[in-house]
Amino acid sequence: MPRLLTYNVHRCVGVDRRLDIDRIVGVIAEHEPDIVCLQELDVGRARTGFIDQACAIAEGLSMSFHFHPAMQVEAELYGDAILTSRPERLIRSASLPTVRGIPGLEPRGALWSVIDIDGVQVNILNTHLGLVPREQRLQAQALAGPDWLGHPDCAGPTILTGDFNATSMTRPYQLLANCLPDAQRTLGLKPSIKTFPSSFPAIRIDHCFVSSDIIVRSMSAPFSPLARMASDHLPLIMDFDVNPEATRRLVA
């Protein structure tokens, strides 16, 4: 059964303020996912030793990857990535809109890859939304629009995941949930699985939204001592099947 893991890795700095990429790799590897969606990766940044974290984690997991730099300061990059052990190709990697005139807002972006799941082309979209409700709404609208979820090529089996910085009570969440159902709600999970903060998870801001062709089998958030220490978020894991009647198209 395919397994997706989404994880805000906090630039591989744990709650003990220690930079440790191997610890992040260990948390992920323990659960043997087929698809990994990561947020808050540093690539070539002085603050984390100029390491390409996306490449290092992918190598540690023996996966291919695509990275999108939501923010670039000269040669230093910060952003998100999709990793997988399955055949894949990148469809789109781009910035999301922001609000001008508000100091301190970080640029945000998203990636869209197509991954082959037993001969079926599955759209995987990974994102990390902003902190301010107004920019979150703009970003959610963009994701729901013609460049992303509304694109004709995104009509098949689709998973949108990441750190949305938005709970289920917010307008950005509700806008996206109107496009694709929340995976946790398709399972009727009560209480819901929360991932932030990792030491005492009380908030649900990491989500998986799925199309009707994605059959969610189970969801979990590892709460091991290692997972609680490695990042300020816990990973969110989703086991799923793809509707066998979905169009079977091999990745080119």
Per-region residue spans from a language model:
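Membrane-embedded segments
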Residues: 44-45, 54
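Generic internal hydrophobic packing segments that stabilize the cores of diverse globular domains
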Residues: 51-54, 80
